[in-house]
Amino acid sequence: MLQTSNYSLVLSLQFLLLCYDLFVNSFSELLRMAPVIQLVLFIIQDIAILFNIIIIFLMFFNTFVFQAGLVNLLFHKFKGTIILTSVYLALSISLHVWVMNVRWKDSSSFRWTNGLQTLFVFQRLAAVLYCYFYKRTAVRLGDPRFYQDSLWLRKEFMQVRR
């Protein structure tokens, strides 16, 4: 079971990774003159998103609901966050690769192709949704109902058995 002190630590780590993601999304364009620094920031951002995915799944595995065999219930409740986070990771990696390819040799020019602008807008839109849904999921996973046997869990288990 996830204890309060551990949950606070995990939640703080998740929010720290989200803040880093927000920081890179906000200020990475200011570093276009230093492509190596921008590349390092992008790599760390992608790793932070991947760590957030791993942390959410570890929190799933720690729940009583998961241990009782109701994996489908957890994934049904949180499938939006799982899908959105995966899409956001793919969009972020795509944007980072494209930006680095366009600007690596000539970082002093400010080139934006139509495709790059479109990808940029979708990645930033996905970033807003990712932050909202990820925070909501992280807080909802702190609900004690997920970590102990309860009437709610028994009802859900009976519905699955039917």
Swiss-Prot record:
Keywords: Cell projection, Cilium, Cilium biogenesis/degradation, Glycoprotein, Membrane, Transmembrane, Transmembrane helix, Vacuole. It is a multi-pass membrane protein. GO terms for cellular component: cilium; vacuolar membrane. The keyword Transmembrane applies. Glycans are attached at residue 6. Its main location: membrane. InterPro entries: TM_138. Pfam families: TMEM138. One of its GO terms (biological process) is cilium assembly. The chain crosses the membrane at residues 7-27, 41-61, 80-100, 115-134. It is found in: Vacuole membrane; Cell projection, Cilium. Required for ciliogenesis. Belongs to the TMEM138 family. PANTHER family: TRANSMEMBRANE PROTEIN 138. This is Transmembrane protein 138. It comes from Rattus norvegicus (Rat).
